[in-house]
Regions:
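Conserved N-terminal entry element of GNAT/NAT acetyltransferase domains
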Residues: 1-13, 147
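Conserved GNAT acetyl-CoA-binding A-motif
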Residues: 102-114
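Short glycine/proline-centered loop/turn elements that form peptide/ligand docking sites
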Residues: 92, 96, 114-118, 135-141
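Conserved acetyl-CoA-binding loop-helix of GNAT-fold acetyltransferases
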Residues: 82, 88-101, 120-124
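Conserved GNAT-fold acetyl-CoA-binding loop/helix
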Residues: 15, 19-46
Length: 149
C-alpha cells in the first residue's frame, strides 16, 4: 500500500491508464460483469462526458496512476476510482477531500445500493443518505448521498 502520492490535474496522456484502472477496479468489485466488454463504451463516456464536463484529479506515484476523482461544476462526483492495492489507504480520503475543496458548497453522488464497502467509506467521510434512485446508465438501484459543509 502506497503512503506517498501526489494529486494533480488530469492530462490527456492519462487516458489509457485511467480507463484500465476503471476496468480493473470495477471488475474486482463486480466479478459477474464483463467490464472488458464495456471498455469502448467507457472510453467514449470518459471523453465525451467526464473529460468534457468535469474536473478530474489523479493520484500518482512515480508516474503510476493510483486513483482519480471526477467532480463537475454542480458538485456531482461521478467517479471515485482507487486501485485495489490502495483500498483501505488514505488515497481515497485525499481524493474526496479534493472534491470537497473544489465544490465547497456541497458534493452529491450516486452509489450502488449493493456496494456496502463504498457506502461505509462515504459515511465515514461525512456523506449522508439523500434518497434512493436508479442509475440512469446501468439501471441498478443506487443511493443518493451528499456532503454539506
Amino acid at each position: 500500500m502506497t503512503t506517498s502520492f501526489q494529486l494533480r490535474a488530469y492530462r490527456e496522456s492519462d487516458e489509457d491508464a485511467a480507463i484500465e484502472l476503471w476496468r480493473r477496479t470495477w471488475q474486482l468489485a463486480y466479478p459477474s460483469i464483463d467490464f472488458a466488454a464495456r471498455v469502448a463504451w467507457w472510453r467514449e463516456r470518459w471523453r465525451n462526458e467526464l473529460v468534457a464536463n468535469a474536473g478530474i484529479v489523479v493520484a500518482e506515484q512515480a508516474g503510476a496512476l493510483l486513483g482519480f476523482v471526477t467532480i463537475d461544476d454542480k458538485g456531482y462526483l461521478d467517479q471515485l476510482v482507487v486501485g485495489p492495492e490502495q483500498w483501505g489507504s488514505k488515497l481515497a480520503d485525499a481524493l474526496v477531500d479534493e472534491a470537497r475543496r473544489r465544490s465547497p458548497s456541497g458534493v452529491t453522488l450516486l452509489v450502488n445500493k449493493d456496494n456496502a464497502r463504498a457506502i461505509r467509506f462515504y459515511e465515514r467521510n461525512g456523506f449522508s443518505h439523500a434518497g434512493e434512485d436508479v442509475n440512469p446508465t446501468s439501471g441498478r438501484p443506487v443511493l443518493r448521498m451528499q456532503w454539506k459543509p
